[in-house]
Amino acid sequence: MMSLRLFSILLATVVSGAWGWGYYGCNEELVGPLYARSLGASSYYGLFTTARFARLHGISGWSPRIGDPNPWLQIDLMKKHRIRAVATQGAFNSWDWVTRYMLLYGDRVDSWTPFYQKGHNATFFGNVNDSAVVRHDLHYHFTARYIRIVPLAWNPRGKIGLRLGIYGCPYTSSILYFDGDDAISYRFQRGASQSLWDVFAFSFKTEEKDGLLLHTEGSQGDYVTLELQGAHLLLHMSLGSSPIQPRPGHTTVSLGGVLNDLSWHYVRVDRYGRDANFTLDGYAHHFVLNGDFERLNLENEIFIGGLVGAARKNLAYRHNFRGCIENVIYNRINIAEMAVMRHSRITFEGNVAFRCLDPVPHPINFGGPHNFVQVPGFPRRGRLAVSFRFRTWDLTGLLLFSHLGDGLGHVELMLSEGQVNVSIAQTGRKKLQFAAGYRLNDGFWHEVNFVAQENHAVISIDDVEGAEVRVSYPLLIRTGTSYFFGGCPKPASRWGCHSNQTAFHGCMELLKVDGQLVNLTLVEFRKLGYFAEVLFDTCGITDRCSPNMCEHDGRCYQSWDDFICYCELTGYKGVTCHEPLYKESCEAYRLSGKYSGNYTIDPDGSGPLKPFVVYCDIRENRAWTVVRHDRLWTTRVTGSSMDRPFLGAIQYWNASWEEVSALANASQHCEQWIEFSCYNSRLLNTAGGYPYSFWIGRNEEQHFYWGGSQPGIQRCACGLDQSCVDPALHCNCDADQPQWRTDKGLLTFVDHLPVTQVVVGDTNRSNSEAQFFLRPLRCYGDRNSWNTISFHTGAALRFPPIRANHSLDVSFYFRTSAPSGVFLENMGGPFCRWRRPYVRVELNTSRDVVFAFDIGNGDENLTVHSDDFEFNDDEWHLVRAEINVKQARLRVDHRPWVLRPMPLQTYIWLVYDQPLYVGSAELKRRPFVGCLRAMRLNGVTLNLEGRANASEGTFPNCTGHCTHPRFPCFHGGRCVERYSYYTCDCDLTAFDGPYCNHDIGGFFETGTWMRYNLQSALRSAAREFSHMLSRPVPGYEPGYVPGYDTPGYVPGYHGPGYRLPEYPRPGRPVPGYRGPVYNVTGEEVSFSFSTNSAPAVLLYVSSFVRDYMAVLIKEDGTLQLRYQLGTSPYVYQLTTRPVTDGQPHSVNITRVYRNLFIQVDYFPLTEQKFSLLVDSQLDSPKALYLGRVMETGVIDPEIQRYNTPGFSGCLSGVRFNNVAPLKTHFRTPRPMTAELAEAMRVQGELSESNCGAMPRLVSEVPPELDPWYLPPDFPYYHDDGWIAILLGFLVAFLLLGLVGMLVLFYLQNHRYKGSYHTNEPKATHDSHPGGKAPLPPSGPAQAPAPTPAPTQLPTPAPAPAPAPASGPGPRDQNLPQILEESRSE
């Protein structure tokens, strides 16, 4: 529905845009067709650099003369146009181009308005060479006849050079001028109007701070009002009100500031239903109207500029507007054009003119660091009189300085702390100082009149009666020759202006010196006085706090070129009040070492929700966050029905529903106790299924389950355990009895909490009453901090694009061993053809984390470099990056912040149109391999785990530990990944400990026994009946242990890394308890024992039929297994040697159908097979007995024979399929549940013991995890000093001997070898093709060297023998003969 409304608003904008507002297709180049006389400039450099050559793509370009202090290029479009873009080039084939410039526009050549980009920046970026065209599409279209370009910076290797292009289209203007006593009204053609969508649009300019611009109303409370209040534009709108509607319809929205600047401002209001857009000068504010109506019902008139006739009594306190209004559009009707044409439906009040008659005061804009204007005065007069008007945001600045004549001193007027301070210094006398005014830096015009003459001085501000300040003091006044406004030139010794005050930044006008008005036109053209760093005929003041860039209701204070945010009492800090001051939860306070008490928390961090106060119940292992409300006491309800129910709203202390919902959403667990008591009042039992009473939770969702029940079912707690008063109903209150009944319990589903309302609807009968009671919301844990994902194969996650407006903060943890990768990236639409906005955080190298972005000023990046370690060390590292209009910063772990201040007037609009990539750059470039967790953008946690997809290479959690664990989980323990470590889940085993290797056992005194019920008789009969109707497929019966039929499966063995399958189970189960066991086709039994007595029954499993299983000790001390599956028992002798030696023994028995696997102690595994006549199923198991069989009914005589006097010894690690009775008995918290207490019974003394069994692989348990580890305590004597010295000498002697043997071997091998001369030619490799042996030489052969005697040492493989030398060739005959003596060995 919301998207439909927004679409309709856009549609209405498009439809109405053609009626005087949008001008779609308005993209004509306007400079090219102009005559040369329409192009002017302040000066020109040469004949071919005049303004006429400043057209885009021209053969030259405009360049001012060298030394022009205020150069500008001016375009006269001959009539008013709508301007949408500006483009620049440098001068053709030169080094001359402009790098920064200011754009001024206006309807007259003596009144200019600076065009401000987003962020109130009046500076445009220009060119970087002489040929490329740089185009700026303006964020809103303005109308003007004259365009002026003021260069601010240019190529330092050249000079100013400019070619210009302006894009737009002709504009038809219909202007109405109001003098404060005028107004017009437009009457609808068909009387009253009723509309679902509306468009109001117009332009205005004024010098007044207050005035009514537009008003219309209806008889049912509908109205639309646009007015100026304090130079702010206010929109009041209502779609009507009614006594039966609870919500009022009035809505007020404010935009802009200092709108009384005699500049055109463009206003537009679009509405569709209750959704509306309010636009001022290109800044659009979307809001939703209050109330419940969607149509605007108006009477027959719209008033412009004020009220006419009887309508004045409705808005008697409003001032009429004084100024110009242009092109008033209402739903495609141009009311201003109809007024100019004197249409019959237009009513005039007063003399409304059809052209602007606003005054032109010729202001001066002071915006430079050393700006000033110097004008001459009339010297040696006895009366000094100065007056002027100024407006500014700055607290300080020099307004006026003048030297008195005859060396008598000087006079200073300065702005200090928002008031005008006067200082008169005279030679030989004490300085006179006094002040006047208050908060004069409010951005409005203020008039100053100062007069000083002999013995007294007077200053008045704004001609307020009684506000002038008169001072009597012995003064001698002689006026000087010069007056400096706005600052002092440098150097001061040359100009004679000596002041320590900073330059004034703001605007001045109507300068008067000694009673004469200064002609500023002469000053501008250097015919009077002097100036520097100022602009004439314009005032560049703007409201930098509108819109307010300070977040979370921070207060904005501005100066001429910047603003400051004050964040006191907001709960936030930082340059824009974006960073949260408080922690997210009580768990964070616990981890920081706090104690129980009241604390302020901020669950959404830097998000829009406000912080609030809660009570933190901080304990050793967790911290409960407690949020109280106004329903902590019982609420009585009578007289309610389903048609008119009682709505019990829950108002939480210090917090709204959204803020409490954010707390619950970020918590690991939440609970809230709800109790409903009734007297002759029903709760859920209705004929139509819709309940009488229910509760409302998060997001205003209705829930029909009550405390102690589960979501999705319409029941109370008693309906789950079938303990309701009426077994046929699901709640106690549904019995509808004339006595008090109660349904109560905990609500624990986090996504439904908190409870926001309780609705009661069945108390309107006689003697009917209901009461409900709700306890505080209690939460613990943080499920956002460990929202983790791992990237394995260069995958990426795609999220919706970032829409952060003016500030963005990103925080996350990463862990990797890869040297580089992109954590996240979001790209936007192109600024131009070759640039796109983006934001990216990446691991650039193993030692560098980079935050890179482009917000329109080019590529920027911040880098955190690590010298002491690498970031890819497979440890968790915290990254925090933030960007706003004031600065960008980056931090890794606890290293210092890396800061990058933003240029002044920077505008940031972090709204992107492409998906947000997490784990890589766009299109999966530069992927990250590793783990990410707790990724938050502006306080919102990204659900990384929810986007995990194993097929794409992303997995929930930071996996990898359980693949190759350092210490495996034994006895079927389940390995659980814990991001930076792992744990072993021992719930499905009979063991505990860190790796499921600690035995849990009990010592049985004589006569002690234990019974564990596997299922009740009623359940067994029902199960057996269903089993007979539909026999399940083998291997899929309940109780079947997965994995038995898997190839390579070894029954009874759970080696390192064994992992049982995960079973869905709500909450944490009772240790060792897994509910009833039905007909099974296999058993897995394991236990350990030690005893000195025989005979005894160690373990016995009975059934509701004659089937059983037993492990017993015979009289001779041997171990025997007995099975009865069907008719006859099966007996197997487990051991041939006695086991009654008091030592621990282990037994592992596994049966799969008719295959039996047995292992006792460390003997080899044996396999037995049952006869085909034996049944393969243990039917209807009933109970498990340990120590002794106390079963009723028929028992095998052999079992009775060994059953007396009972087992005496120790049993541990007992497990029958998925039941561990001893672990359940010793590890279940007391008191037990009724179901568990009924299932288990112990007779006699049973005390916990591990039966002397050592934990498995004790040596592999790391010492830091073993609580029983003690360091070695053996005495150590340092008596091995001489032994170490002797050993050192012995090793050195052996090494020397080995080296000597190698030297002797070398000498012996080379004894007869040396260098000698021969006349034999060298062999040529290409003279014997095919590898044939060469012929013997014709001359005498050289005697071969004697072969050395063989040694015992192994020799390396011999090198290939060289070919015999041939006779001297022609190349070797002329070589010089080198004779060498043989070296002596």
From Swiss-Prot:
Superkingdom of the source species: Eukaryota
Record motif SH3-binding, residues: 1334-1370
Domain F5/8 type C, residue spans: 26-169
Transmembrane stretches, start-end: 1285-1305
Intervals, Cytoplasmic compartment: 1306-1385
Residues covered by region (Disordered): 1317-1385
Gene3D superfamilies the UniProt entry points to: 2.60.120.1000, 2.60.120.200, Galactose-binding domain-like, Laminin
GO biological process terms held by the UniProt record: axonogenesis; cell adhesion; central nervous system myelination; cytoskeleton organization; mitochondrion organization; myelination; myelination in peripheral nervous system; neuromuscular junction development, skeletal muscle fiber
Laminin G-like domain segment(s): 204-356, 390-539, 814-958, 1089-1251
Ranges where the EGF-like domain occurs: 545-577, 962-996
Keywords: Cell adhesion, Cell junction, Disulfide bond, EGF-like domain, Glycoprotein, Membrane, Phosphoprotein, Repeat, SH3-binding, Signal, Transmembrane, Transmembrane helix
Disruption phenotype: Mutant mice exhibit tremor, ataxia, and significant motor paresis. Normal paranodal junctions fail to form, and the organization of the paranodal loops is disrupted. Contactin is undetectable in the paranodes, and potassium channels are displaced from the juxtaparanodal into the paranodal domains. Also results in a severe decrease in peripheral nerve conduction velocity. Double mutants CNTNAP1 and CNTNAP2 have wider Ranvier nodes compared to wild-type littermates.
Keyword Protease in record: no
Keyword DNA-binding applies: no
Database matches in Pfam families: F5_F8_type_C (PF00754), Laminin_G_2 (PF02210)
Functional note: Required, with CNTNAP2, for radial and longitudinal organization of myelinated axons. Plays a role in the formation of functional distinct domains critical for saltatory conduction of nerve impulses in myelinated nerve fibers. Demarcates the paranodal region of the axo-glial junction. In association with contactin involved in the signaling between axons and myelinating glial cells.
Protein's name according to its UniProt entry: Contactin-associated protein 1
Gene: Cntnap1
